[in-house]
C-alpha cells in the first residue's frame, strides 16, 4: 500500500501485525485480501496491509514455510516485511495483533487512547476455535504449526469479513 495515497473515507483500512511480519501477519494480509476479492460486497472496499513489531526482517518476503503452506490453500503471500510505526494509526481503522505481546507492543506504539481503541486481537474473531485466545507463532515449529496458524487466521478473517459485510465491525 502506498502510504502517501489519500485515504478514502468510504473504505475500511485493516492492518495485521505480528512479531516480525514474516509468518502470521502476512498470512492474515493474504487471506483477508483473497476473502475480500472473493466477496462482491467487499471487493475494492477494504485496504489490507501487514507489519511487524520488530524491524529484523524489513524488506523480506514472508517465511518460505508460510508461503508454501498458504499456497497450498490458494493464497499468494508476496508482501515485504516492514515495521509498524505510529503513523500507521493515522491510516488504519483497525489494527489486529496476533497475541498478547503484539497487543501490548501496539499499545506502546499508539500515541493516544483513540489510537489504542483501534487495536484488536485477531483471535477474538475466531468462531471455530474457542480454545485459542491467540494465534500462536509457528516460526520455531513444524508444518503442523503453520497449518494451525493458517486455520486460526482463516477462521478469524472469515468472521472479520462477515462483520465488514454487515458493517458491524
Where are the regions a protein language model picked out?
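Phosphate-binding/catalytic loops
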Residues: 2-6, 94, 100-169
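Helix N-cap/beta->alpha junction signal
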Residues: 25, 99-100
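Conserved active-site segments centered on acidic
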Residues: 2-91, 162-169
Amino acid at each position: 500500500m502506498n502510504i502517501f495515497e489519500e485515504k478514502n473515507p468510504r473504505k475500511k483500512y485493516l492492518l495485521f501485525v505480528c512479531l516480525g511480519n514474516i509468518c502470521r501477519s502476512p498470512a492474515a494480509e493474504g487471506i483477508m485480501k483473497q476473502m475480500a476479492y472473493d466477496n462482491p460486497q467487499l471487493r475494492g472496499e477494504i485496504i489490507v496491509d501487514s507489519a511487524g513489531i520488530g524491524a529484523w526482517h524489513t524488506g523480506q518476503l514472508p517465511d518460505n514455510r508460510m508461503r508454501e503452506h498458504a499456497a497450498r490453500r490458494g493464497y499468494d503471500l508476496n508482501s515485504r516485511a516492514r515495521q509498524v510505526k505510529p503513523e500507521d494509526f493515522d491510516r488504519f481503522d483497525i489494527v489486529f495483533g496476533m497475541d498478547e505481546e503484539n497487543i501490548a507492543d501496539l499499545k506502546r506504539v499508539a500515541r493516544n487512547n483513540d489510537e489504542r481503541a483501534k487495536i484488536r486481537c485477531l483471535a477474538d474473531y475466531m468462531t471455530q476455535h474457542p480454545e485459542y485466545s491467540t494465534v500462536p507463532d509457528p516460526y520455531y515449529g513444524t508444518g503442523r504449526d503453520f497449518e494451525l496458524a493458517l486455520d486460526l487466521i482463516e477462521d478469524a478473517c472469515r468472521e472479520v469479513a462477515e462483520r465488514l459485510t454487515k458493517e458491524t465491525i
